[in-house]
């Protein structure tokens, strides 16, 4: 089996890792960073991903950030006359990470383990798998982020039994998972969370504060100005990060707006205590799922051996303090919160390929699954925090005499009424033979695979007629849509490659023109007028070609000029060699000339005596 990469597809940042020997290694992107912003931008038909896309977000309205928050929904982004689904945009980020891994490995990568928040529902998980497929990746496994973090933390601690609480506060989602580690088995006991809570929300409270203060002082509402909002977002994110290390930071945004008397500047000092006051309700919101996870696992805080913090937002001192206060234990600081999830995904990839042995991962389904029954109630078949993969069956009957069909309304959630839970899908079992109500026996079976994706079957036990459905939420893509998007992604990748090649060719041609001009000037009298004229003509021809759009013409003219410069250089070397040879010959002839000399014998003084 070829290399399987581990990917943390994050809301604000993503990361890719590979197993080297027994150790997971985070792969740096071309900019040298270990994480890549989950940002996609479109400009003049070109797609940009990562840091380069994030840098121009202020001036480019066609920039998409935090798309992960819309996974599993029918949300679409309209850009330059085309609609993009969250799956397509996420695929562009995955393609970028895939390319980073391929450049590092020097080989094609087509398999991956991708992480998702533990609290992602079926539709969100399916959307993530679809994104992988569009990016040209076979998703070997969808793994929960806190579980991946625990894998990375506990790989070298398999000898000891530990109960670990993973507190994962990322850019857009929040999860708490409790795992039991021992003898190479990583068993998830419970999970809880909030898919709409993360670092973006902490940024937002700062943005709201800045907007409010600026309005008080200048009477201008910056929230109505898109460009100003983007600048505020960048400043808020930076201030949040600064306040993890210092107690006060200065937010300075000159020319943020204009008033009657000219340009307006935003200049505000933000203290850590003020930020903590603004974010207090968000921090409190993280505590409820933490308590729920402990309750579901049947554990008290004193039974937790270790607390692992995951996600960039856990760097906020107030978050760390809240966790410490709630659990009564200092959080473990030995893992990098931005990278540990991707590293865990790489370890799971190693388990799949057989490179990591004696490790067993037992994950759970985060939400209860069931169907709607009479009275609009939800009847639960699989309780939340059930270990997966799993299967559960239950027999139901008809509600009316001679009922010819039954509607199976598949639900996910914890509320007693069907309407309060999430609809995963609906299907019908038809052709039920006429019979009094309560007589037909309809067996409904729920199957959840290792990725947490649900398959439901309904079977008439009297006729053995069967109908099944792999849950497709309203946002799920059909095979045809995925195939089209895969093709689009491949074409875009090819177009991007061609654009890069064109830029490289033009740069090389520009450099060659400069080189020729310099060479001709340096050689001066050492080349003939004819050679000089030929070089000038070929150089001018290439310059003219560079002004046009014909790539083949640029390539041809570049090759012609390269040939001329090579011939010129060869001639110069030849001339230099001849001159050197001639000099040596002249020196040799001088050395071989022998002159006669007169010698006179001089006797010693003693001989004179």
Swiss-Prot record:
Modification Phosphothreonine occurs at: 173
Induction statement: By stress conditions e.g. heat shock.
Record keyword Phosphoprotein present: yes
Ranges of biased composition (kind: Basic and acidic residues): 525-542, 597-609
Residue pairs linked by disulfide bridges in the UniProt entry: none
Compositional bias annotation for Low complexity: 574-587
GO molecular function, one term: unfolded protein binding
PROSITE patterns (alphabetical): HSP70_1 (PS00297), HSP70_2 (PS00329), HSP70_3 (PS01036)
Keyword annotations of the record: ATP-binding, Chaperone, Nucleotide-binding, Phosphoprotein, Stress response
Pfam families attached to this UniProt entry: HSP70 (PF00012)
Chain segments carrying region Disordered: 525-553, 574-609
Domain of life the protein comes from: Bacteria
Family assignment from sequence similarity: Belongs to the heat shock protein 70 family.
Stored HAMAP family: DnaK (MF_00332)
Described purpose of this protein according to its UniProt entry: Acts as a chaperone.
Protein name: Chaperone protein DnaK
Organism whose genome encodes this protein: Staphylococcus epidermidis (strain ATCC 12228 / FDA PCI 1200)
Encoding gene per record: dnaK
